[in-house]
Regions:
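Non-catalytic cap/lid and distal C-terminal segments of serine-dependent acyl enzymes
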Residues: 1-193
Length: 193
């Protein structure tokens, strides 16, 4: 039996137990219009990390779902899932923070084991805004074998990451570098002109 296509997306929120954090892990998932559990090869996945003082709902509040729906339905981009983890302790220092382990060892395996997604490196992207961009760069470069693309929007970088950057880049095999996208808003209060 073929599934009936419904030309609307949906966002669902999930909670899973975590061995790395002292609380449960929460994350939202954007499912594109006409999502199907039967899609051959699965869907590409974007792990979108929110900024400090925000939640996993930040991307939806910014209108990302409507923009993605429009681009997908107009054939401008291929359908994909956007996974939006919630970093509950976003005021903690990055050093010693278990959020990256919770993402790579708990959220990603759960998504890939329960949803119809492509599990190849080039099907997996990580991006974030502000603090989320710092995590995206750290996780994407230090775990470069897992991500085909990295997006950093209004990137502040964690303090020690500037020193680690040359080592992360040197560890990446030639020709295996992830695609890298970086931008900042013209009116970002932290941008000095």
């Amino acid at each position: 039996d073929s599934e009936i296509c419904v030309n609307t997306s949906r966002v669902e929120r999930y909670q899973i137990d975590s061995n790395h954090l002292s609380t449960a892990l929460f994350f939202s998932v954007y499912f594109p219009p006409c999502y199907s559990d039967m899609q051959p090869d699965g869907y590409p996945t974007l792990y979108a990390l929110h900024g400090q003082n925000f939640t996993d709902e930040m991307w939806i509040d910014l209108g990302a779902a409507e923009k993605m729906d429009k681009l997908i339905l107009e054939g401008e981009i291929e359908p994909f899932l956007m996974v939006m983890p919630f970093e509950e302790y976003f005021f903690r220092e990055a050093e010693g923070n278990q959020f990256p382990l919770a993402l790579s060892e708990e959220i990603i395996p759960w998504v890939e084991g329960n949803l119809n997604v492509c599990t190849k490196k080039n099907c997996r992207a990580i991006a974030g805004i502000s603090r989320g961009a710092s995590w995206a760069v750290r996780i994407g470069l230090s775990e470069w074998k897992d991500f085909g693309s990295i997006g950093a929007h209004s990137l502040p970088t964690f303090r020690k990451d500037i020193d680690a950057l040359p080592d992360w880049l040197a560890a990446i095999s030639s020709g295996k570098e992830p695609r890298f996208y970086m931008d900042t808003g013209r009116f970002d209060p932290e941008v000095k002109t």
